[in-house]
């Protein structure tokens, strides 16, 4: 079973809380609808997955973005979200984020979160 699948199942079972904002939900849906995922998930499966996340996660407003925190300006909102929601960890597979050594909260890869859980 893949690391993302294991984390998803642990989240569904209540092992940790997931915090999202509208911008993150939009990004998730957009990524899952990219051509490279068409052979893996149907549009209906994407709709169902996004709805499960939307219903089950803690939803907060889009954060005030702190610019220049990350190398990719499109990722700055993720750090702002994690900070404004006062979470323990920001979990991301993006190396630009996981390489941030001085950001709070700490950025963990999905595998590192799985190790902690």
What is each of the regions a protein language model found here?
Residues 23-25, 45-69:
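Acidic catalytic patch
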Residues 1-20:
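Short, well-structured N-terminal submotif of metal-dependent ribonuclease cores
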Residues 15, 54, 86-87:
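Residue-level detector of structured alpha->beta connecting loops
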Residues 68-74, 97:
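Acidic, metal-coordinating catalytic cores used for nucleic-acid/nucleotide bond scission
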Residues 72-90:
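Acidic, metal-associated active-site segment
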Residues 1, 23-44:
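A short secondary-structure junction motif
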Residues 84-91, 95-117:
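Acidic, PIN/NYN-like endoribonuclease modules and their adjacent C-terminal/linker elements
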């Amino acid at each position: 079973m893949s690391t993302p699948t294991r984390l998803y199942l642990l989240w569904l079972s209540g092992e940790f809380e997931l915090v999202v904002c509208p911008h993150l939900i939009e990004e998730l849906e957009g990524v899952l609808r990219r051509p490279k995922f068409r052979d893996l998930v149907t549009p209906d499966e994407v709709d169902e997955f996004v709805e499960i996340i939307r219903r089950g996660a803690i939803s907060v407003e889009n954060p005030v973005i702190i610019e220049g925190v990350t190398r990719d300006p499109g990722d700055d909102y993720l750090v702002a979200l994690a900070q404004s929601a006062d979470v323990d960890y920001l979990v991301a597979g993006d190396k630009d984020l996981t390489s941030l050594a001085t950001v709070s909260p700490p950025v963990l890869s999905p595998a590192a979160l799985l190790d902690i859980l």
